[in-house]
Amino acid sequence: MAPPPKKPRRTAERILEVTLELFNRFGEPNVSTTLISAELKISPGNLYYHYPAKDELINSLFTRYEEALGQLLHAADDVRNVEDAWLFFHMLFELIWQYRFLYRDLNDLLSKNRKLETQFQAVLKNKSHAVQGVLDGLSRGNAIHIASREAEPVATAMVVVLTYWLSYEYVRDPRRALEPESAGAALMRGAFHVLSLLMPYLDTASREHLLKLVGTYQN
């Protein structure tokens, strides 16, 4: 008689869920494996069985982020107007928020985790390619008029804002900026400031529509 099928590794999944919550709330450097096991009400040995080192938790979460990001960045090809762009960048910020510990502690993580050191370069490259795709789509839709020599530095500036916006929010208000109740306003501000870099190149109707979109979200 064949053995019954194995149950899903629910414990491993739950470990990642709780680890992500703790990393996002307190910052990765401030969360120990002891705290994670205590929060889960499991023994440190059980945690070690599934994830023998803290780096394995970080790497597993990063892999999930990287996969979700790859799927989302494909949507850049569908951008044709400022509303499409607004939705794209807002969704991108929502994903960044979901894994905000990576951006809150980015420099620290890169300095001590070899996988992140190498793979985050690919993340930046993929973001840059997607943002350039957004600019190309807006140009094809006649929403922006930008010379090719200006498009690359503008795209780079947009990626910089995408990458460090949550760090800026954290510096502005360390006690509350990365709490869940702050998410809506932070994401709206981030999306607007990314798109505001296109203001000099937007046609009049697109510029007015962007400001209207921001006003709708603020209200």
Task: Write out the residue ranges for each language-model feature.
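N-terminal positioning helix adjacent to the helix-turn-helix/winged-helix DNA-binding module
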Residues: 4, 11-18, 154
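Helix-turn-helix
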Residues: 14, 22-60
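Short, basic, alpha-helical segments at the C-terminal edge of helix-turn-helix-like DNA-binding modules
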Residues: 63-69
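Secondary-structure edge/capping motif, primarily at the C-terminal ends of alpha-helices
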Residues: 73-77, 103-110, 138-142, 169-176
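Hydrophobic alpha-helical connector segments
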Residues: 74-101, 155
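Amphipathic alpha-helical segments used for helix-helix packing
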Residues: 96-118, 132-136
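Amphipathic alpha-helical packing segments from all-alpha helical-bundle domains
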Residues: 115-141, 152-167, 185-200
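C-terminal peripheral helix-coil segments that are non-catalytic and often amphipathic
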Residues: 167-219
